[in-house]
Amino acid sequence: MAYTNMQAREQLLQSVAQAIDEIAFALASLGEAYEQLDEQSADRLEQELFKPVQAAYGRAQRTYNSFAGRHELPDRQFGPAPAGAPTQGVKGFLDSAVDGIARADGALATLQDSMLPVEVGDAELRAGLEEVRSLLGEVPAHARQFVRTLGR
């Protein structure tokens, strides 16, 4: 059976959607952690962790919908994800967020390694995926540092 460009584009969008869903989960987890922190720590979490993940989430959605629009495929509205039980505590929510980021980055890395973005010939998509991964890249290290200094 021949692999068509349309099938390749749809598969690519499925992979990007999977990553977006994981980023949404990370955002929800960070939001829950934020709610449990004092004002100073919450502000730090917002600057160091939430903002880069939120930027990656927005960029990933724009990348998805722009690609879909250029190739006459349906766009998608992504909604918030549940974060988990509040009994996890701040560290638990941060661990969950980092896990979600790792899954999103893994999905995007696998997609990039597959050469599918090159095969469909879309430079804007490749640039968008690269930017999302770049935005997420430092977050796990910042989260570890945040946990180490929490309460000090």
Indicate where each model-derived feature is located.
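Short, solvent-exposed, charged loop/turn and helix-capping segments
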Residues: 66-91, 143-150
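Preference for long, well-ordered alpha-helical segments
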Residues: 100-103, 107-152
